[in-house]
Structure formats: structure tokens, C-alpha cells
Amino acid sequence: MNKWPRIMELIVAFGLIVFKVALLIAILLLLPLPLTWLERKIAGHMQQRMGPMRVGWHGLLQPVADGIKLLTKEDHIPAEADRFLFKLAPILALAPPFVVFVAIPFGETISVRGTEITLYLSNMNVALLFVFAVIGIEVFGVIFGGWAANSKYAVLGSLRTCAQMISYEIPMGFAVIGVVMLAQSMSLLDIVRAQTDVWNIVYQPVGFFVFFVAGLAEAQRIPFDLAEAEGDLGAGFHTEYSGIRFAFFMVSEYVIVLLVSVLLVILFFGGWNGILVPMPPLLWFLLKVAFFVYLFIWFRFTFPRYRYDQLMAIGWKVLLPLSMANIIITGVLLGAAAAP
């Protein structure tokens, strides 16, 4: 029996997986370049300025110049710092958001020259659990970065981050339980397929609100950027970082913004399922994600920063009760709908 066709199939399948992983890593690493340009442009126009204009047409090459500047800066390590943890922290902050995208589907399949290619790396039946388990590791990078620097500002920033992420990951996790109950699955593909006719935002507006606000806090974006508040902490947990290590933290922040936007689209807005206007599913998905990324940027230049006590109160006194009430109401309604 000739086994070569089977071996060739395995080689092609393995090569395709390697290509997908390499493409995903390249996109996520380069993502901050256009996003920083977009953020500065949006800020400029909201403040009746032009934004970056010097480097390239309308400042398009400004992110490249900023990247070169970061790469050529001195990689400074404070004399009293814990050198091992100081070097490890940026990697721990950057790696988890990248790993999470292994479980993120961007569509069903596309046909390339007669070959069906899936737009996901893995269809996990517990994908949601995997996402929350891995993203929780990111907090260790922030804590180690603040502690290892041996700086008061950095330590305070890392402690704030730890408290903030614990306070908001709980309601964030509770917010998706209603979605899981509707789809009867923790697979992100199954959740999108369950929204073919009606998006979950119709059934889960409270869950969406809780997840969106908690996502803002998880991404440490204004109005929840207490961990790196410039006014009272310098730059927070990465005050002592410079050069490529500082760039790691910046890339991590933008990747988390993208991740939260992708999860919002998949969980509540039908993923790649469109309405009214016929468009390719992948284009629908990208447009929805782009809308939420823009919303994150818009919030930064619209809302003031909350005080620390207000931040904690919103998480424990508002979002947590809302998310628990949403679970109870969803369960009651599903039970009533299933009753004869």
C-alpha cells in the first residue's frame, strides 16, 4: 500500500498551519503601527488639529519612525532592579494575548484555487474557557514589571493593575455565561453559528454592556487606565522601561484592544454573519472589529479618568450584580421558552 499520498497530505497540512501561525504573528506584531497612526489622527481631528503630517503623506510613516526610535534607544535596566524578572515581564505581558488568538476564528472557510482553507487555527470546544484562562496570565507580566523595577511608581501601578484585572475579569466572565446558555456551547464557532438569524446583542444587551465596560478595563484604556495614569504615576508599571522592552508593553496593549473587539463581535454581533447588505463574511467581520477598535480610540479622547475608588465601585457594585442578574434572567427565560 502506497503511503506517500497520505504523507504528502500531512506535510501540506502542517505547512498550512505553520503559514497561518506565521501570518497571525506578523499581523499582530505590525498591528500597533497603523493603530498608533490612526489613534493620533483621530485625536488630532477631535481636537481640531491635523495630527502627524511630517513623515510621509499625512504622517503615514510616522509609526515607522517611532518604531525605529524605540529599537535604537538604550535598553536601560535600573541598578537596583531584579534583572531576571525585569527582562521576563515584557515577554509575559506580550505572549498571552498572542496565544489567545490560536482559539479565535475569523470565519468558516475560503476557497483558494479549489482548496478549502479554514480561517481558524483550532476549533476548541472550550474556546471561551481557554481565552479567559490564558489572558489571565498577562497580569503576571505587569506585576513582575512593576515589582522588578524597584520603583515606587511602578509598584503602585502594578498593584493597581492586579486589583483592577481581578475586579473586572469576574463580571467579564459572568457576562458571557448568558451567551453560552443561548448557544449551548463554549466553542466560538458554535456561538457564531447560533447567531445566523438573530445576533446575541438582541437577547443579551446587559451582557454586552458588562462585557464592553469590563473589556475597557481589561485593556487598561481610558477611562480605566489607572495602572499607568501619567498624572500620579508617571507611566505606571512600565515607568522604568525603555527601548524594545517598552515596545513589548505597547504592542501588548494594542493586541488586547484588538482581542476585546474581536470577542465583542463574535459573542454579541454575529461574528462574520451579515445583515441587509451582501458582503463577503470576512469583510463583515473585519468591518465590525474596526468599528469597536475605533470606539476604543474615541473613548480615550472623550471621557475623563475615574478615581481609583470609583473604578473599584463600578466593578464590584455595578457590573458584578448586573452580570449575575443577567444570568438569572436568561436562565428563567430559557426555561420558560422550553416549557410545554
Curated annotation (Swiss-Prot):
Keywords: Cell inner membrane, Cell membrane, Membrane, NAD, Quinone, Translocase, Transmembrane, Transmembrane helix, Ubiquinone. It catalyses: a quinone + NADH + 5 H(+)(in) = a quinol + NAD(+) + 4 H(+)(out). Its EC number is 7.1.1.-. It is a multi-pass membrane protein. Its main location: membrane. GO terms for cellular component: plasma membrane. The keyword GTP-binding does not apply. It is found in: Cell inner membrane. InterPro entries: NADH_UbQ_OxRdtase_su1/FPO, NADH_UbQ_OxRdtase_su1_CS. It comes from the Bacteria. The chain crosses the membrane at residues 10-30, 84-104, 126-146, 172-192, 198-218, 255-275, 279-299, 318-338. GO terms for biological process: aerobic respiration. GO terms for molecular function: NADH dehydrogenase activity; oxidoreductase activity, acting on NAD(P)H, quinone or similar compound as acceptor; quinone binding. NDH-1 shuttles electrons from NADH, via FMN and iron-sulfur (Fe-S) centers, to quinones in the respiratory chain. The immediate electron acceptor for the enzyme in this species is believed to be ubiquinone. Couples the redox reaction to proton translocation (for every two electrons transferred, four hydrogen ions are translocated across the cytoplasmic membrane), and thus conserves the redox energy in a proton gradient. This subunit may bind ubiquinone. NDH-1 is composed of 14 different subunits. Subunits NuoA, H, J, K, L, M, N constitute the membrane sector of the complex. Belongs to the complex I subunit 1 family. NCBIfam families: PRK06076.1-2. This is NADH-quinone oxidoreductase subunit H 2. It comes from Rhizobium etli (strain ATCC 51251 / DSM 11541 / JCM 21823 / NBRC 15573 / CFN 42).
